[in-house]
Amino acid sequence: MRRSSLAALGMVAVAALLLAGCASAEPNGPAATEPATETPQSDPDLGAAWLDGGRLIGLVTLGSSTCVPQAEEADLVDGVLEVTLAEPAADQPCTMDLVPRVTLVGVPEDVDPAKALPISVSGEDYFGEVDLAGVGGLTPGGETDYLPSAGWATAPGQFIVLTWGSSTCVPVISDVAATGPAELTVTYEAVPEDQVCTMDMVPRAAVAAVNGLAGVADVQAILTGDQFDGVAIPIYGVSA
């Protein structure tokens, strides 16, 4: 009986302390404030390039090669292209590498590719701004011609190559070299003979870089290897 009485007394003491605490609290005290949401710093590595005759823009960000963000929206607001990025599903496995990867954005028809285009990119815990130099002769909107294209990005020597084909047989760049005063060659790895390719047709974009062509206009890219046999395409813009 003694042990039970001590336990009962302990419970009464705890209840008394709780009541005392409630009585001493100020009924009109200041409400708890939520912590301020921090705005993420602008990504210094964000890049951009014109592609597909002006129908697409490739955005370059750093991150996992297997978890590339997708563009949800792209709207021209007061002369600024505002792009919203969506991250892959939380349960999607992501490699732990840190590489430049490309998010493709459809260009609104009211954008004039001949003029410099400020781009603002936002997403979950992400923000970046970049200015894309204008390129004449490009036209946004309309249907793609499914031909390869390339555009200089905003980082020095960096460019994006866009090809079309199977989503499971994406061409892999093995080498890039300047092969002339206004020419570079992109070499792709050979496709394994036993590789199975789906019959879909999707855009496939890859980031590459080359030295020695800064400031050179009208550079041609020669695509070799894989399904390409010396295909020549212009690189939109000028290398930084």
What residues fall within each predicted segment?
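Bacterial N-terminal signal peptides that target proteins for export
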Residues: 1-10
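An anionic, turn-rich surface loop/hairpin at beta-sheet edges
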Residues: 86-102, 188-209
